[in-house]
Amino acid sequence: MKRISPLNTLFYLSLFFSYTFKGLKCTRIYKIGTKALPCSECHDVFDCTGCLFEEKESSHVIPLKLNKKNPNDHKKLQKHHESLKLGDVKYYVNRGEGISGSLGTSSGNTLDDMDLINEEINKKRTNAQLDEKNFLDFTTYNKNKAQDISDHLSDIQKHVYEQDAQKGNKNFTNNENNSDNENNSDNENNSDNENNLDNENNLDNENNSDNSSIEKNFIALENKNATVEQTKENIFLVPLKHLRDSQFVGELLVGTPPQTVYPIFDTGSTNVWVVTTACEEESCKKVRRYDPNKSKTFRRSFIEKNLHIVFGSGSISGSVGTDTFMLGKHLVRNQTFGLVESESNNNKNGGDNIFDYISFEGIVGLGFPGMLSAGNIPFFDNLLKQNPNVDPQFSFYISPYDGKSTLIIGGISKSFYEGDIYMLPVLKESYWEVKLDELYIGKERICCDEESYVIFDTGTSYNTMPSSQMKTFLNLIHSTACTEQNYKDILKSYPIIKYVFGELIIELHPEEYMILNDDVCMPAYMQIDVPSERNHAYLLGSLSFMRNFFTVFVRGTESRPSMVGVARAKSKN
C-alpha cells in the first residue's frame, strides 16, 4: 500500500482548513449576533453570496414624487387574478428596449386593458368549450369509436380532435336527416373516421414528436398587435407592453438655458427619452415638454437614426440628438437621447395614448450599457465619466406614505434605512438581477429547483411570479373581504414570504405585500413570465418591495461584479 507523504498530508489539510475557514467567513455574515464581512474583505462575493456594504454617505439627493393615474385603483390587479383562476392564462413580457422601459414588448396590452383582456379570454374559453362539447357529442354518437378516441386523448394534440368534431357534427346532422339509412351510414362513418383518425394521428405525431412545454412555445411567438394568443393546448397567452402602473419621477434639467422635465428613473432600461414641443397631439400637451429650439447646446444627431416605437394601440416617433443635462448638482454634457415628436393612436375604438396612461415627460434609464440603443454611452456612465468624484452607485428610498421618496446619486443616506445593507452580486450586466436560491410562502417552498433570479426594477409597481408558481401562490395567499377597520386582524393569519439568497433571507410580511381595494385584501403580485436563458424571473417592484426595503445599486469594477444592496427601510420618513 502506497504511503502518503507528510508534505501531501499537510497540503490536503491546508486546503481543507482554507475551504472551511472561507465558508465560515462567508456564512457568518448572516449569523445572529455576529457582524457581516465588509465587501472589501470578501474576496469572492459569489462564494459568499454577498457581503456587507461599506457605507458611503452622499448629499446628492433627488426628491421623487409618485405619478399615478389613479392612486387608489388596484382593480386591474384584481381582474388579473380573476383571469388566472382556471389556470389556463399566461401573461408575459419580452426583454426588449422601449419607450416604456425594457421589460415589455412593442405590441400587446397594458395593465389598464384588463377588462378587454378578460373579455377576449372568456370569448376564447367559450369557443373552446363549444368545440369540446361538439367533440363529446361526436364521440357519444359514434359508440364503436368512443373508447378508441378516449385512449388517444393523452397522445394527440387537441386541435386534431376539434377538427374531427366539426366533421362529426356535419355527419351527425346528415345522419339524422337520413334515418332510413342510419345504420349503413353509421358504419360507413365509423370506418371513414377510423381511417382518417389513424392517418391524422400518425401525421400529428410525426409533426409533434417534440412536444415541448408551453413555456418554450410562447417565447417563440411573434406578436402582431394581438391581444390574446391561443395555443393548441388552449392556453391563452397575453403579451404585455410593459408593467407600468405607478412611476416615481424627479426633476431633470435639459438644455441651455435649462428646461425642467420630470422623467421616470428606471433601473429596468438604459436609454434616455424626453417629450418635445414638436409633439402636438393632445395627449402630449398634457405633459411638460422640452423645446430643443430654445437650447443653445442642443445638436441633432448626424446619424440617420430615428425614434419609432410601435405599440398595440398606436406609435410614437421622433429623432435622436444631444444636449446638456443636469441631475441635481451633476452636469452631463453631450448626452445622446431620444426626442419624442409625435404620437398616433391606431385604436379604432378610441382609448388612451401612451401619455394618457403613463403621463410621463421622459425616462432616464439606469440599467447597463448592454441595453443601450441610442448613443454610445448611457446617462449614468456619462455622469460618472464627467464627474470623477462621484462613486459609481445610486440608491432608492420609496416612502410608504408617498412622502419623501428619494434617488441618491453616489452613495446612500443613513436616514432612510436601519440595520445593515447586504450586497448581492449581479449575475449578468443587463438588468439588475441576482440569483434566487429559494422562495417560501410560510413553510411551503415553491422555488427554486431550476436556476432562478430576481430583477430589481424601479419601473415596475407590483412584484411578480412566473406562471409555474402563480397557481400555488394564489392557493396559499388568496384575496379576501376586508375593511379599513379589520384588515390588520385578518392579515394576522397570512404567511410570511421569504426570498432566500444564500444565507440571506428577506422577509415580506402580510401588511407589506397585501393591498386593500374596495373592501378586498389581495396580494400585490402579478403572474408574469420573462423569457430568459436563466429560467424563472421574479420581479421586485417599487410599490410592493421598495417601499419596505432601501435598495442600493453599485456598478462593478474589473475585480468585482456589480451588486444590489438591500436593507430594511425606515417607515417614519
From Swiss-Prot:
Active at pH 5.5. It comes from the Eukaryota. Inhibited by small molecule 49c. Inhibited by small molecules WM382, WM4, and WM5. Disulfide bonds join C39-C51, C42-C48, C279-C284, C447-C448, C482-C521. Autocleaved into a p16 prodomain form and two mature forms p44 and p51. The active site is at D266, D457. Changing D266A: Loss of catalytic activity. Its EC number is 3.4.23.-. Residues 27-221 form a propeptide. Transmembrane segments: none annotated. Glycans are attached at N334. Residues 183-203 have a biased composition (Acidic residues). GO terms for molecular function: aspartic-type endopeptidase activity. Residues 248-567 form the Peptidase A1 domain. Pfam families: Asp. Residues 1-26 form the signal peptide. GO terms for biological process: entry into host cell by a symbiont-containing vacuole; protein autoprocessing; protein processing; proteolysis. Residues 167-211 are annotated as: Disordered. It is found in: Cytoplasmic vesicle, Secretory vesicle. Keywords: Aspartyl protease, Cytoplasmic vesicle, Disulfide bond, Glycoprotein, Hydrolase, Protease, Signal, Zymogen. The record marks D131, E132, A220, L221 as: Cleavage. Gene3D superfamilies: Acid Proteases. During the asexual blood stage, processes key proteins essential for merozoite egress and invasion of host erythrocytes. Cleaves and activates proteases SUB1 and SUB2. May process members of the EBL and Rh protein families. Also cleaves apical membrane protein AMA1. During the mosquito vector stage and probably in ookinetes, cleaves CelTOS. Belongs to the peptidase A1 family. This is Plasmepsin X. The gene is PMX.
